[in-house]
Amino acid sequence: MVHRPRLLCLHGGGASSQIMRIQFSKLESALRKTFQLVFLEGPLDSAPGPGVLPFFKDFGPYSCWVSDDRSLSPEEKRQEETNAIAYIKTFMLQYGPFAGILGFSQGARAAASILLEQQREAFTHDSLFGVFFCGTFPPFIPDAPDISLPTIHVLGLTDPYLRESEVLLEHCTQQSVRRVIKFNGGHHMPTSSDVTQQIADVISMTYRTSQRKRVSGIWKKNVVDSRPSALEI
């Protein structure tokens, strides 16, 4: 069987891995020959999120990565965020390798947090990139630097969270690959087959680019490591 690189998929707050699989069915079909999509369930129970009802009223229970409980103290909120990051990292280490992370809405915040963790202190040898669908802001890491790993941003032009998606884009450095796809729609996955195929093509291109850079980096490191030191004769 031909190995297909895995893409980790993180659903929105108040949804579920099952709901996300339905929402991403067109994209999964477009990527099927190239990638395997893996859908992870959020760690916390949740009420239904934006846009979930009434269509997914029979698809509970619902979950999230961090809660919207305003009664939590800053310390409790920070602990939720830390737990979410640890939960996702543990899954990735157990079921990886993963080539990239796809996140919808709150799932994009979670995906951005994992990219920032990988930047800060690599926890996996995977060469990661992120795809943010109708992403919200901020990540689960306070005072985070800009994301320098490759990212793809899918923005709905009538999404009520569009400004948050734009802020997330602004916090991804232009020095790396940073691609933007806009569609006529709100806080949901694009329904157009043309837009879906465009997203699939950009994901494939970003993966190929990241792999070339990874191989080039390994080759350069091996060349440097193979050079004699000043003490060798």
From Swiss-Prot:
Question: Per its record, what are the GO molecular function terms?
Answer: hydrolase activity
Provide the active-site residues from the annotation: S105 (charge relay system), D159 (charge relay system), H187 (charge relay system)
Q: Which domain of life is it from?
A: Eukaryota
| EC number(s) from the headed UniProt entry | 3.1.2.-
Q: Which Pfam families match?
A: FSH1
- Keyword check for Hydrolase, yes or no: yes
Which key words tag this protein in UniProt? Hydrolase
Record-level GO BP terms: secondary metabolite biosynthetic process
Q: Which GO cellular component terms, listed alphabetically, does the Swiss-Prot or TrEMBL entry include? A: cytoplasm; nucleus
Entry-linked PANTHER family: ESTERASE DBAE-RELATED, ESTERASE OVCA2
Q: What is stated as this protein's family in its record? A: Belongs to the LovG family.
Q: What does this protein do?
A: Esterase; part of the gene cluster that mediates the biosynthesis of the mycotoxin fusarin C. Within the cluster, FUS1, FUS2, FUS8 and FUS9 are sufficient for fusarin production. The other FUS cluster members are not essential for fusarin C biosynthesis.
Q: What is this protein called?
A: Esterase FUS5
Organism name: Gibberella moniliformis (strain M3125 / FGSC 7600)
Q: Gene for this protein?
A: FUS5
